[in-house]
A protein has these predicted regions:
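Residues that cap or initiate secondary-structure elements
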Residues: 25-28, 43, 121, 130
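A short C-terminal boundary segment appended to hydrolase-like catalytic domains
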Residues: 117-161
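Short acidic, glycine-rich surface-loop motifs adjacent to enzyme active sites
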Residues: 30-46
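Divalent metal-coordination and catalytic microenvironments
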Residues: 22, 37-40, 77, 115
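Binuclear metal-dependent hydrolase catalytic cores centered on His/Asp/Glu-rich metal-binding motifs
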Residues: 1-32, 54-59
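Conserved beta-sheet core of the metallophosphoesterase superfamily
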Residues: 47-125
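Active-site-proximal beta-strand elements of phosphoester/diester hydrolases
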Residues: 1-4, 36-38, 93-100
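Short, catalytically relevant binding-site loops at active-site mouths
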Residues: 1-2, 41-45, 79-81
């Protein structure tokens, strides 16, 4: 963890050199690959989350990842599930937060996310502890970026309906 000149150091700080190295690797992924980045803190403010973001250099990192085509930025820290677009320019990555397996209640039951995808969309299902087992709590369907294959599938689906 880097040094921060603020009293609440739990808000996090982003190292832009690490960000650029990760973005370079992700930008060179095969065409059509689902690009997922995992980090502890949500990079930008997620409306509806129980805690504020305020990650130092988080907005800049989000823009870098968005520009290199990252589909999902998977995070924790706030301990509640969410899936929200991070729209910058004409592209959108999604910020996807997971719960925690801790039994200490934080506004959502203990839980985790299940992620499934195809060429058109990513489906994120938040599973929560019911007291005896994990069960689906909420599901988000997130459209993938427009790759040529995804565009063709969307066009074919709209013609047939």
């Amino acid at each position: 963890r880097g040094w921060q000149m603020r009293t609440n150091w739990s808000k996090g700080v982003i190292d832009l050199d690490q960000t650029r190295r990760a973005a370079y690797a992700l930008a060179n992924a095969p065409q059509g690959a689902l690009k997922i980045l995992a980090c502890h803190h949500p990079l930008v403010e997620m409306i509806g989350a129980p805690m504020s973001g305020e990650v130092i250099r988080g907005e800049r990192a989000a823009r870098i990842f968005n520009d290199c085509g990252v589909d999902l930025i998977m995070t924790g820290h706030v301990h509640v599930p969410f899936a929200l677009p991070i729209t910058m320019g004409d592209r959108a990555s999604y910020g996807v937060g997971a719960g925690t397996l801790s039994m200490r209640e934080r506004g959502a039951p203990a839980g985790f996310n299940c992620v499934e995808w195809d060429d058109v969309a990513v489906t994120v299902t938040a599973l929560g502890w019911s007291g005896s087992h994990f069960e689906p709590q909420r599901t988000w369907r997130l459209e993938r970026r427009q790759t040529p294959k995804a565009a063709a599938l969307r066009a074919a689906a709209s013609i047939s309906s």
